[in-house]
């Protein structure tokens, strides 16, 4: 399975106080150790780095993501992301701007989204987004 890993899962994976049995973190660890393709997006890295982080934490994140395959949006992905968010909004499922772009990247590259953000699960009922389930 090819996964696009969202900010919520990376954040849990990097925290020291995350319980070891969080299903999404276990799935990420297995994917990284196995033969699954694991991707993230530049916008996800930005979300992780945003705000004040000690220099050593920034350095650790930079080192870990240096070998990661980053999905980057193309011009048409921005238009497609807006087209995804609109039907979700009409159906009462919130899909924010950045989340719409992440969803579009997953759809465009035929990836399953690994996330703990319930907004994606709700949106998946209205758009062709595959969200990982335990």
Task: Indicate where each model-derived feature is located.
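Histidine- and aromatic-rich ligand-binding microenvironments
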Residues: 5-6, 40-41, 94-96, 117-118, ...
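General small-molecule cofactor/ligand-binding pocket signal
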Residues: 39, 71, 130-132
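Short, well-structured N-terminal submotif of metal-dependent ribonuclease cores
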Residues: 1-40, 50-63
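Generic structural signal for small/hydrophobic residues in well-ordered secondary structure
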Residues: 6-7, 48, 81, 106
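Acidic, PIN/NYN-like endoribonuclease modules and their adjacent C-terminal/linker elements
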Residues: 2, 103, 107-134
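A general structural signal for well-ordered alpha-helical segments in protein cores
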Residues: 25, 45, 58-61, 78-81, ...
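Active-site neighborhoods of divalent-metal-dependent phosphate/nucleic-acid chemistry enzymes
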Residues: 69-116
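A generic structural signal for short hydrophobic patches within well-formed alpha-helices
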Residues: 10, 45-48, 120-121
